[in-house]
Amino acid sequence: MGAQGVPSNAVRGWAKLIQDQLKVPIYFFGDLDAYTMQNIFRTLKAGSAASLIRNADFSAPDVKFLGVLPEDIKKYDLHDYAVKENDIGEVRALKKAADVLKNDPFFHDKRNKGLTKILEWLLKSKRRCEQQALFMVDPRDPTMPEKIIV
């Protein structure tokens, strides 16, 4: 599953139905950046902070992240790049990441420890990597199927 930005109620409701009724695993494929982790992936897993009343109906808490992880950059020699000070959107996302790590209960829940560690790494390293970087890895490489986490 992927999203063009923060997933709508319809996308999240659909993911919830698949998770609950079909009992099949759901994976989210996204970039390794602060915005994706704290807004897109978090909203899919836990629902929208703006609509707390019905989040149980519009979230898929068992969704897994399938994408670039911090350790993948070195392990697979993936192309990543530094967040530049003039990239206003990325700088803003990093500032918000620092805030959500302190104040959002989602990131204090032990079930989301992996996501919290990723956000901490993003804040410390000030780097990002896009999902397309994975396409630089040879698909015949036997280590690629091991990548599912979070």
Question: In which residue ranges do the predicted regions lie?
Answer:
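TOPRIM fold recognition
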Residues: 9-150
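Metal-dependent catalytic core segments for phosphate chemistry
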Residues: 1-6
